[in-house]
Amino acid sequence: MEIRFATKEMIPQIKEIWNRCFGDEEDYMEFYFTHRFSEENMLVCMEDKKPVAMTTFLKAYLVTGEGEIPVHYAYAVATLPEYRGRGYAKMLLEKGKQHFQTPIVLEPASESLIYYYEKLGFRMAFCVAERTILPDEIAEAKGEEKGQQKYWLLTVTPDEYVNLRDASFTENGYIRWDKDAITYALLENDYADGYAYKVQHHGREDLLLFREEENAIEVLETTLSEQDLLAVLKRLRIKVPVRVRKSLAAVEREERAGNDKKEQGYQKKDFGMITGCDEAENGYLNLTLE
């Protein structure tokens, strides 16, 4: 068995791993490999003269009390079923950590994988706050009065998204993505028929990233306060449940300020793990291409 970086010539075989392990269709895989794959960010295990396991390592930055440190996010960790049980995922993660010389961050896809990654030296270090807003709550929310528009939903560029995001999530443990990563996250959200807005209101600007799911709306990221989020959802005439994900630190700030009692409906959810660093605790990891 050999571990090496993937090449473009391997893409058809890597797509087979991707499809068999994750079930994604050809059009999405083609989209991903067109926009995010490089021969410097994916490691594969070679067996029988073909790739049989893979892991992509995407660069990011961890904000700490002394600045920030480079990390890599391990994405799409997968092994063909007939080659499992040989420790290939562990080897790929160790090789990535050794090659890039940075801490490794990942999002476990299930609770059982949390225990698996703990055995490999990872620990839970990132979380989010989540809740579901029901249609009645949106209908009862205070919105704009007729003829007095307060919220302007504008197209957001990758540069604007990066700047607004970094200005909002400044706490220790924040995983900062660079412009390339944010550009892809916005492209993928658009591919999934999602929406990304820069919301101008009350002399400030906030972010709102969401997409439509079956009979629901999924807010993947926002910097809006709960009161402003409800007002924007009302302006958009949302009539279905809205599942919201926020930074836990942002929710706690709202609770301390006492501005929005609705923030108390949020529940903490463990979201991401790290190895090779003791700095992060209840940090904020998001836009993970889950």
How does the language model describe each region?
Residues I11, W18-V63, N172-A196:
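Active-site rim helix/loop that mediates acceptor-substrate recognition in acyltransferases
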Residues V44, K50-Y61, V71-Y73, A78, ...:
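Conserved beta-strand in the GNAT
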